[in-house]
Amino acid sequence: VQPFEVSPILFSFGLFLRLISIAWNKIHIEMVVHAPSESGSLIRLLKSLDAADYLGSTPSLTIELPQQADPQLLHFLQQTATFTQLSGHITLRRRIQPHHMDSAESSLRTVESFYPLDPETSHLLLLSPQAELGPSFYHYLKYTVLNYKQSARAKSVFSKLIGISLELPFSSPTADGKSFAPPEMTVKDKEQLVPSFLWQAPSSNAALYFGDVWAEFHSFMSNRLSTPESVTAPHTKLISERYPAFMEQLLEMIRAKGYYLLYPSFPGIKSSSIATIHDELYQHPEEFGATNPSVDERKNDPIGLGSGEQPLSHASNIMALLDLFPSGLPDLDALPLLGFNGEQLDATAYSKQTEEYLQQFRIYYGGCAKDTKTDDPSADLFCLQE
């Protein structure tokens, strides 16, 4: 680990001493991106990653290549002068199997692309090749991870937070693809946007997932794929085929465990964002490719990934962004919470929906009988011994 480097951001909230006390340099973020067969958009992402400020500790980047890798991308990666910061930090993994992946294979490949060395300090930043990140994205991630995951307060408060999205989508990832606007809160009798909110929706565009949660997702996927479904189980796909297949299983785990991600509202408040998702070079996931008629019909779909392509901030740090948090980052229980369908929930509705879906999941997908009793159903989604 490289020595701790002092950045201007660290002085803004009296963080310097706090960061030392909770071992800033023990936090490791590993970046993963799955390359499509045509990688023009990925090259744009790589350039933005190389231009970011990593506070003296460049994270690793794993690029998952398809069987038919783009020669232009390979040539770009082989040029010695291509990178300044990412040089020596990139790992390529190329798929061997010649056939197109189905949904199960794609989900497994995504989940297996990362496993934390230390679940408490190693975290996954999953990126879409359509993404482009601002130079200060790493500042924001470190700051929010420290506050909501690694701080003494975060460790003392029970939380269902599993990750942090860098982008604000302007449409829901669900199959209906309906437009989305961040929630408002009433402050001093006025409706206004808050800088962040919680949402029970997974993201594959630009999202950090905590290491312990991704390790749990490994176990979930192993049990999910090996447990026979009930003959009465519904097969309605909730996540749009614009997104990778693993999102469907991750949504299942999120709903069954009552999890949520932290999403930013500030792209809707400020004129720029720390992450934007481009649509002009968008390609559908391989597992939902040309053999699927429903995808063919949407190849000219202008929605793409529904990000709205917010202008990207080129600020070298997030000092201006942190003006939105004059008292520091808010407590999670003070933020609006949305269900997976975008409906705002209070604590009672949130608990009720989680309990109802949990019971359905255990019966339909967990191999559990209706009358199965357990002290903590959320800790035992699967009845593997029945």
Where does each model-flagged region fall?
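Peripheral/terminal regions associated with large enzymatic or DNA-binding modules
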Residues: 1-126, 131-386
